[in-house]
UniProtKB/Swiss-Prot annotation:
GO terms for biological process: translation. It holds the Pfam family Ribosomal_L23. HAMAP family: Ribosomal_uL23_B. Disulfide bonds: none annotated. Binds to 23S rRNA. Part of the 50S ribosomal subunit. Belongs to the universal ribosomal protein uL23 family. Keywords: Chloroplast, Plastid, Ribonucleoprotein, Ribosomal protein, RNA-binding, rRNA-binding. One of its GO terms (cellular component) is ribonucleoprotein complex. This is Large ribosomal subunit protein uL23cz/uL23cy. It comes from Gossypium hirsutum. It comes from the Eukaryota. InterPro entries: Nucleotide-bd_a/b_plait_sf, Ribosomal_uL23-like, Ribosomal_uL23/eL15/eS24_sf, Ribosomal_uL23_CS.
Length: 93
């Protein structure tokens, strides 16, 4: 399992860092418990809450043919006070 794909850097995600909440896109087939165990083992932190939602894929047109990108899952991970996750690589768009 790959776990976290990349960190999401938006206005809301930067605002949530003050509350010790980290936002990232993860594999669409992974569950909350899988991601929670993976984050706790890999980073050595304690997760107290996880919020997730699935975002729809975007439409892409190639001439007369309409296609779409794959949907993905976004997780907001809340850590216990005193714990933090080091900066991860962000996806450039």
């Amino acid at each position: 399992m790959d776990g976290i794909k990349y960190v999401v850097v938006t206005d809301k995600s930067i605002r949530l860092l003050v509350k010790n909440q980290y936002t990232s896109n993860v594999e669409s087939g992974s569950t909350r418990t899988e991601i929670k165990h993976w984050v706790e083992l890999f980073f050595g932190v304690k997760v107290i809450a996880m919020n997730s939602h699935r975002l729809p894929g975007k439409g892409r047109r190639m001439g007369p043919i309409m296609g779409h990108t794959m949907h993905y899952r976004r997780m907001i991970i809340t850590l216990q006070p005193g714990y933090s996750i080091p900066p991860l690589r962000t996806k450039r768009t």
